């Protein structure tokens, strides 16, 4: 027994000796050392946000596509996570770094039509309905491969919004940016260049990727992303111009592709931030339009949207406010003098989604059936406003209202105006990394 005890002591001593020796060469978990760019340093980090919500009003036609609360009946309430992140960042040396990020999130929330109790959830869930982690980022960065430019290879953040626009909006815990709601990828598998010049006042991002986010590529068509940005007035005024392109189907007699143009302007400071983001997305040969006199045409889908937001301090480092309004038209090509109905042919996710007439189980409240209305033309008006209470740095409680209004563009049906209204107590916390501003969440 004495011999076994001695062996255990020796093993424990050996473990601590190895750990101490390793610590002398590597700092596996130091945010400050990692941010300083020190060799052989890394950090474990993560953040979480979710809500307690109550849906006081439900759109009778369950429009909104992949919106957070589409397909959830009136008077439903629940506690829910909307995102959990667990990441590790590592500096090999001053020239090379890497990142790995695992995510569990409601990318396509359970209950979104046409998902029902019989067809299964449409969210990022396992076959038995449990939320699970997936690989969201996994890449290596070669810093200053050309002076001022980094090369990034692997699953990485795209130039679309996550690197800049989302950070200025700040409140991803409340809602996605307007282009994110329409599922422009925030991450993708490919090779990219990130450039930054003039003391960080000007820059660009380019990326060639699969266009399938974390999923394996199913075609050879690539998604081409790019943006250029500039900061003025001591980096308070921010301007960003973004564009992307992807072929969707390409064969004799049918050329189907998408191309987005997006602009963003904001004034950002600690006391107050105001911004506007707008986009036009042209999706060629994407819509079947039924003629009044019979027959049909294949026409383009021309979607456009604009978002206005503001957030600022009430009590510095303790209490803030935020508000946002989005206006979205899924297709400005609607012509009631020529066509009676529209339907998507093979639209990219988030576009040309119709409403659904749904029934729910009287005993459980789960979705039972979902029947398409066949009308994807409804204009959306989104509004959110709330408060951000920070009892401690990196911990946030955010009471807010979430409102989405829908109105059809078809004269044959009338506007059929209705809305979703949700009241929420949102919580957010981050660990392992720290930001320069107390209110910063991203």
Task: Put a short name on every predicted segment.
Residues 1-10:
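Bacterial N-terminal signal peptides that target proteins for export
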Residues 7, 80, 184, 378-379:
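Short hydrophobic/aromatic segments of transmembrane alpha-helices and their interfaces
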Residues 9-19:
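Bacterial N-terminal signal peptides
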Residues 20-24:
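Sec/Tat signal peptide C-region and signal peptidase I cleavage site
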Residues 27-29, 37, 55-60, 69-73, ...:
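Outer-membrane beta-barrel pore domains
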Residues 31-57, 73-213, 220-239, 311-331:
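Outer membrane beta-barrel
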Residues 218-221, 255-256:
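Short glycine/proline-enriched turns and hinge-like loops at secondary-structure junctions
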């Amino acid at each position: 027994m004495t011999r076994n005890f001695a062996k255990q002591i020796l093993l424990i001593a050996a473990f601590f000796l190895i750990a101490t020796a390793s610590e002398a060469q590597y700092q596996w978990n130091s945010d400050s050392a990692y941010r300083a760019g020190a060799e052989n340093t890394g950090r474990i980090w993560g953040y979480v946000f979710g809500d307690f919500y109550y849906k006081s009003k439900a759109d009778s036609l369950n429009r909104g596509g992949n919106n957070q609360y589409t397909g959830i009946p009136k008077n439903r309430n629940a506690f829910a996570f909307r995102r959990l992140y667990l990441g590790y960042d590592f500096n090999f040396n001053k020239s090379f770094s890497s990142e790995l990020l695992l995510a569990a999130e409601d990318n396509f929330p359970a209950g979104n039509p046409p998902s029902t109790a019989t067809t299964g959830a449409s969210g990022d869930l396992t076959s038995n309905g449990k939320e699970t982690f997936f690989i969201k980022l996994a890449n290596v960065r070669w810093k200053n491969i050309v002076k001022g430019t980094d090369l990034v290879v692997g699953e990485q953040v795209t130039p679309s919004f996550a690197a800049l626009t989302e950070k200025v909006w700040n409140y991803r815990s409340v809602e996605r940016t307007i282009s994110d709601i329409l599922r422009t990828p925030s991450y993708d598998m490919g090779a990219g260049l990130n450039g930054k010049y003039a003391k960080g006042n000007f820059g660009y991002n380019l990326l060639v990727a699969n266009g399938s986010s974390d999923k394996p590529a199913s075609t050879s068509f690539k998604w081409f992303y790019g943006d250029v940005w500039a900061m003025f007035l001591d980096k308070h005024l921010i301007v960003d111009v973004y564009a992307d392109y992807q072929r969707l189907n390409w064969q004799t007699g049918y050329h189907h592709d998408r191309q987005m143009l997006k602009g963003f302007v904001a004034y950002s400071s600690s006391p107050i931030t105001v911004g506007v983001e707008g986009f036009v997305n042209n999706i060629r040969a994407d819509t079947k339009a039924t003629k009044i006199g019979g027959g049909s045409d294949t026409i383009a889908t021309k979607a456009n949207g604009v978002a206005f937001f503001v957030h600022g301090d009430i009590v510095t480092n303790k209490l803030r406010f935020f508000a946002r309004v989005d206006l979205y038209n899924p297709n400005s090509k609607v012509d009631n003098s020529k066509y009676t109905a529209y339907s998507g042919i093979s639209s990219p996710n988030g576009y040309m989604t119709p409403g659904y007439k749904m029934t729910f189980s009287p005993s459980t409240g789960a979705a039972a059936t979902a029947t398409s209305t066949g009308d994807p033309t409804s204009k959306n008006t989104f509004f959110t406003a709330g408060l951000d209470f920070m009892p401690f740095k990196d911990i946030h409680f955010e009471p807010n209202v979430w409102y989405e209004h829908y109105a059809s563009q078809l004269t044959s049906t009338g506007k059929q105006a209705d809305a979703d209204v949700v009241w929420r107590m949102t919580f957010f916390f981050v660990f392992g990394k720290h930001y320069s501003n107390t209110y910063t969440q991203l």
